[in-house]
């Protein structure tokens, strides 16, 4: 099961404080791998920190390089690679289906988690949110 693999390979290794949940496609069904992973903000931050650090705790150096280097430009002119968005050079951004964000700024040694419950039709809002997260990250240092 996907949830068991995720627990063993990531959740336990980052030292998550809380159990996470994953929506399934039906009663006793399979996890929706494309979405619907639910966790506490501090545990999302742990994942962001682990991916941003040089530690191979949850991902190899080559996998981290793949995540951090956009291969295509998509919406808003952002780069994209392997489920990771790149709204600005050097910035990594994981986005959930309804407004969950894990923003990584290695230059400022910052990870910001933003949890939301937004409609999927909130077009254009991600660009504004990324801009605010960038401003917060740059001002904190």
Question: At which residue positions do the language-model features occur?
Answer:
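Extracytoplasmic/periplasmic, Sec-exported soluble proteins
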Residues: 2, 35-39, 94-96, 121
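Active-site helix/loop module of the DD-peptidase/beta-lactamase fold
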Residues: 1-34
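Structural helix-adjacent loops and short alpha-helical linkers that scaffold large soluble proteins
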Residues: 1-7, 54-62
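Sec/Tat-exported extracytoplasmic proteins
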Residues: 10-18, 41, 48-55, 71, ...
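Non-transmembrane alpha-helical segments in soluble domains
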Residues: 7, 11, 45-52, 68, ...
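Active-site Gly/Thr loop motif
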Residues: 17-23, 65-119
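Short, gly/Ser/Thr-rich active-site loops of penicillin-recognizing serine hydrolases
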Residues: 122-141
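Active-site-proximal alpha-helical segments within enzyme catalytic domains
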Residues: 35-56, 100-117
């Amino acid at each position: 099961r996907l949830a068991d693999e995720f627990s063993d390979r990531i959740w336990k290794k980052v030292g998550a404080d809380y159990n996470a949940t994953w929506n399934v496609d039906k009663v006793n069904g399979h996890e929706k791998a494309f979405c619907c992973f639910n966790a506490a903000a501090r545990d999302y931050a742990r994942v962001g920190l682990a991916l941003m650090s040089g530690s191979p705790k949850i991902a190899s150096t080559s996998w981290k390089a793949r995540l951090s280097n956009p291969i295509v430009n998509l919406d808003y002119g952002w780069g994209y690679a392997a489920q990771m968005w790149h709204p600005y050079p050097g910035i990594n951004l994981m986005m959930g289906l309804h407004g969950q964000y894990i923003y990584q700024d290695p230059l400022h040694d910052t990870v910001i988690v933003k949890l939301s419950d937004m409609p999927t039709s909130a077009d254009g809002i991600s660009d504004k949110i990324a801009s605010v997260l960038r401003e917060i990250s740059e001002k904190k240092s």
